[in-house]
């Protein structure tokens, strides 16, 4: 539903450019994040998430205005969103009441020894909506059985990152002395001072860049099939996820679309 609202708003904003546009493109594709920042790495190290869990379909549209037979200006909007819930790997949670403490604590999972009261878990959501301006070069022009193109440009990326649920504070280590063996066991507080964690970066804006290439294949009068590869370079500064470097919002995008030529 959110994707539909964003795309409808984008179509409304860009509708005036149809007067000058030569091509309207509607497309669907797959987005593969590049995961090149420490918050991504932390999630994959600590949680039972896989990188493939964050590969997802995306939708978009674009308008092309041809400056010459071989060069066009492009305005485009795409949309990506993925939410995944998972469990911490190798840890169980004990309730504060069980321990006689003020906070829940995470213990290393050891069968028949530390089985826990529950399994600590949280959801991690990423949403990215790029609004991009590109220059597209068609070296062979706009006519032919195959119409290849390359290009690139700049964009404004609207994005959200959200974590909701349990957070184990591995930076705050305590020592639990096992009464049976006398062994010292490192343990960690869960959501200290709160029932759950709710960390959000809402409706943030960042500037990014992209490169693209593809091919258009005529299939009917005024209609071509488009296959496109796009790579986005973008990182967003985090404010509420304290201690983390800028978040990698970039990735690879493979899409298929239909072009209507005006």
Language-model region placement:
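Predominantly the C-terminal beta-signal and adjacent terminal strand-loop region
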Residues: 48, 101, 211, 216-262
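Repeated loop/turn-to-beta-strand initiation elements of outer-membrane beta-barrel proteins
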Residues: 24, 70-73, 143, 221-225
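Short glycine/proline- and aromatic-enriched beta-strand/turn motifs that initiate or cap beta-hairpins
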Residues: 20-65, 259-261
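Residues on the lipid-exposed face of transmembrane beta-strands in outer-membrane beta-barrel proteins
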Residues: 30, 61-65, 77, 131-139, ...
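Extracellular/periplasm-exposed beta-strand and loop segments of Gram-negative cell-envelope proteins
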Residues: 34-54, 81-129, 157-206, 234-251
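Cleavable N-terminal export/targeting peptides
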Residues: 1-23
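Hydrophobic core residues within well-ordered beta-strands of beta-rich domains
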Residues: 57, 71, 129-131, 148, ...
């Amino acid at each position: 539903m959110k994707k539909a609202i964003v795309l409808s708003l984008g179509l409304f904003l860009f509708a005036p450019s149809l007067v000058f546009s030569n091509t309207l493109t509607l497309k669907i594709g797959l987005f593969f994040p590049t995961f090149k920042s420490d918050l991504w790495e932390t999630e994959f190290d600590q949680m039972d998430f896989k990188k493939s869990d964050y590969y997802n379909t995306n939708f978009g549209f674009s308008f092309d205005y041809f400056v010459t037979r071989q060069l066009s200006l492009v305005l485009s909007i795409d949309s990506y969103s993925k939410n995944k819930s998972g469990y911490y790997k190798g840890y169980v949670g004990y309730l504060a009441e069980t321990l006689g403490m003020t906070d829940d604590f995470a213990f290393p999972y050891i069968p028949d020894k530390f089985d826990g009261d529950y399994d600590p878990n949280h959801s991690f959501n990423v949403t990215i909506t790029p609004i991009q301006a590109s220059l597209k070069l068609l070296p062979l022009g706009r006519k032919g059985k195959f119409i290849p193109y390359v290009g690139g440009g700049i964009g404004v990326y609207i994005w959200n990152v959200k974590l909701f649920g349990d957070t184990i504070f591995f930076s705050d280590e305590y020592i639990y002395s096992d009464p049976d063996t006398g062994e010292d066991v490192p343990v960690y507080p869960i959501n200290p001072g709160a029932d759950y964690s709710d960390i959000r970066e809402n409706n943030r804006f960042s500037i990014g860049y992209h490169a693209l290439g593809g091919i258009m294949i005529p299939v009917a009068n005024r209609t071509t099939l488009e296959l496109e590869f796009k790579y986005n370079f973008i990182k967003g500064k985090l404010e509420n996820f304290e201690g983390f470097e800028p978040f990698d919002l970039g990735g690879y995008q493979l899409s298929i679309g239909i072009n209507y030529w005006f």
